[in-house]
């Protein structure tokens, strides 16, 4: 009992604040930065913007505090029951003698929760139009290719090997982490970094690549900041994340999606040997076409020479004919002048003889009179013929003549004309007119 008393007297005494601070130091110094996986429960968001909740597993509970700046960086809604992995530091809160985890980063885990977040994020970005951009064509032979991936692992080796095998070109590697808390930010910064390079150093196409894995492993490629960076890129992007069955949001914002990293390299450059064969084929076609064209024009030149010789001969003949015609004209001109002078003298004599002029005019008047008389007689006969024809037609249409041919006109009691059985159905008295008279008929 005395020993217990002495031991009790030797025990160090602490104040409440001192022991609380000691516990705080013990927790923070021994655990440092940790990751904890669990299920969110009791979530509360204060007016200050800070979030308070418990992270639980079976019956164990860990209090968590997520300060407003950290909460603002989380791109998906927090819900009770959501499985998450939290990174942060352990500390104690002296106000109620409990330890808590101060959240620095929070990522979803568990397939159901992650798919829900993925679908909600996809719907949001799709509504903003980030998946409907005009795709930039992949250049045919890029002189520089940017590759964003992990510097370690098989992916970068496969891409380099495939490009060198198909068509060697300059490869610029921007190493990033392809998995983990800050991976999405690193890849987004790499895309922006390539776009901000000087034009002479800028790649013509960017490959964003990673090998296969679970949805948790590929989660960085669903980051909103990464999708926006891919959408805003002025350099075409080929996404090659996972295997053919794996789909991430960057696939929807990229300009082309490759099923594998190796396929991305094949999309980026053609096969050099195939290009050489194609060029050789085109060269043969060009040579054949050129040869045919030269032969065609050579034949045209031969034909043009023949035409030239023919035209020269034709022109010479025409020139000779023209010369001969000129000589003939010179020989005939004096005779022509003499003939015209004779006609002028004869015409002058006739003009001074009035009797000849009167006889000429009288003869001309006689001819005109005979022509006019004949024309008038022909016109008169034509009118008489038409008059006779119209008179005959008019007589044939006279209803008296029609009655003489056996027809009759039937009228009703009031003198109305009856032209059909229907109009005569209600009549009792009929007046029937023939060519030689009219009779009255009463219906029995």
UniProtKB/Swiss-Prot annotation:
It catalyses: Exonucleolytic cleavage in either 5'- to 3'- or 3'- to 5'-direction to yield nucleoside 5'-phosphates. Heterooligomer composed of large and small subunits. PANTHER family: EXODEOXYRIBONUCLEASE 7 LARGE SUBUNIT (PTHR30008:SF0). Its EC number is 3.1.11.6. The gene is xseA. Bidirectionally degrades single-stranded DNA into large acid-insoluble oligonucleotides, which are then degraded further into small acid-soluble oligonucleotides. This is Exodeoxyribonuclease 7 large subunit. Pfam families: Exonuc_VII_L (PF02601), tRNA_anti_2 (PF13742).
